[in-house]
C-alpha cells in the first residue's frame, strides 16, 4: 500500500504532514487563549505534576455548565439582529459552548434584547419561570438595561431588571455581536466563580 502511495507522488515531492494543533493563539500575548485563566492553570499544573487531577463534584458540574450554556432568544427590537449575528459563522458562539434553543425548558440563559413594553413584561416573566434552575439572564442593549430612548414612555418598562433578576448587562444601542460575546464570556467566568449548586 505504501509503495502505491509513493508511486503516485511526483518525483521530489514531500509527503503532507499536518502540524500539531497549537490552539487559538491570542494575538496580544502570543500565548494560547486561556493561558492566564486561573482555573485552567490549576488543571494544567495538576496534570503535569501527577498525570491526573482530583476535583470536587461542584467544580466538575460548574466546569461542565460553563461549556454547555443553552440560550433562549427573547428578541424584542433591533438588538435582536445583533443577537442573531452571534450565531452566524463569523462569531460562531457554539464554539464557546453557547448554543440557541427554541424552548425555555431546555435553556439555561435568556438574552433579553430590545425594548420591553408593559404588555410584554408578563410574557417575559412567564418564559423566565419556565426555565430550569440554575438560570441566567443577559440584558442586551440600552432599552433592556434601563428603557433607552423610550425611558419616559408610558408603555415601556424602565429596565427588565424590574421583572427578572439580571446577571450580565451588555450596554450599547445596539451593542455589537462582539460586546454580546464578551458578555457571554463574563457570564461563564461568573458561573465558574460562584458555582451552580448554591446561587
Curated annotation (Swiss-Prot):
Question: Would the keyword Disulfide bond be found if you checked this record's keyword annotation?
Answer: no
Class of the enzyme per the UniProt entry, highest EC level: translocase
- Quote the record's binding site residues for [4Fe-4S] cluster: 78-79, 143, 173
Principal localization reads membrane
Q: How does it sit in the membrane?
A: Peripheral membrane protein
| Reaction it catalyzes | a quinone + NADH + 5 H(+)(in) = a quinol + NAD(+) + 4 H(+)(out)
Q: Which InterPro entries match?
A: NADH_UbQ_OxRdtase-like_20kDa, NADH_UQ_OxRdtase_20Kd_su
EC number(s): the record gives 7.1.1.-
Q: How is the cofactor bound?
A: Binds 1 [4Fe-4S] cluster.
Q: Which cofactors go with this protein?
A: [4Fe-4S] cluster
User: Keywords for this entry?
Assistant: 4Fe-4S, Cell inner membrane, Cell membrane, Iron, Iron-sulfur, Membrane, Metal-binding, NAD, Quinone, Translocase, Transport, Ubiquinone
Q: Any idea where this protein resides? A: Cell inner membrane
Q: Specify one Pfam family.
A: Oxidored_q6
The cross-references to PROSITE patterns, in alphabetical order and at most eight, read: COMPLEX1_20K (PS01150)
A GO molecular-function term, please? NADH dehydrogenase (ubiquinone) activity
Q: Does the keyword Translocase apply?
A: yes
Which GO cellular component does the record give, naming just one?
Answer: plasma membrane
Which example biological process does GO assign this protein? aerobic respiration
Q: What does this protein do?
A: NDH-1 shuttles electrons from NADH, via FMN and iron-sulfur (Fe-S) centers, to quinones in the respiratory chain. The immediate electron acceptor for the enzyme in this species is believed to be ubiquinone. Couples the redox reaction to proton translocation (for every two electrons transferred, four hydrogen ions are translocated across the cytoplasmic membrane), and thus conserves the redox energy in a proton gradient.
**Which family does the similarity line name?**
Belongs to the complex I 20 kDa subunit family.
Quaternary structure, from the entry? NDH-1 is composed of 14 different subunits. Subunits NuoB, C, D, E, F, and G constitute the peripheral sector of the complex.
HAMAP family, alphabetically? NDH1_NuoB
Its recorded name reads NADH-quinone oxidoreductase subunit B 2
Amino acid at each position: 500500500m505504501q509503495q502505491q502511495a509513493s508511486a503516485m507522488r511526483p518525483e521530489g515531492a514531500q509527503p503532507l504532514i499536518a502540524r500539531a494543533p497549537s490552539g487559538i493563539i491570542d494575538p496580544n500575548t502570543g500565548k494560547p487563549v486561556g493561558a492566564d485563566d486561573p482555573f485552567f492553570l490549576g488543571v494544567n499544573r495538576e496534570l503535569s505534576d501527577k498525570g491526573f487531577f482530583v476535583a470536587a463534584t461542584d467544580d466538575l458540574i460548574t466546569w461542565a455548565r460553563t461549556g454547555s450554556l443553552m440560550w433562549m432568544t427573547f428578541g424584542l427590537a433591533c438588538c435582536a439582529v445583533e443577537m442573531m449575528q452571534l450565531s452566524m459563522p463569523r462569531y460562531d458562539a457554539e464554539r464557546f459552548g453557547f448554543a440557541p434553543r427554541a424552548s425555555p425548558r431546555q435553556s439555561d440563559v435568556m438574552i433579553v434584547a430590545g425594548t420591553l413594553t408593559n404588555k410584554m413584561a408578563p410574557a417575559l416573566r412567564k418564559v423566565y419561570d419556565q426555565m430550569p434552575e440554575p438560570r441566567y439572564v443577559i440584558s442586551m442593549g440600552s432599552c433592556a438595561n434601563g428603557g433607552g430612548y423610550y425611558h419616559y414612555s408610558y408603555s415601556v418598562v424602565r429596565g427588565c431588571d424590574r421583572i427578572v433578576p439580571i446577571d450580565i448587562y451588555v450596554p450599547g444601542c445596539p451593542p455589537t455581536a462582539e460586546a454580546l460575546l464578551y458578555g457571554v464570556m463574563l457570564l461563564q467566568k461568573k458561573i465558574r466563580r460562584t458555582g451552580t449548586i448554591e446561587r
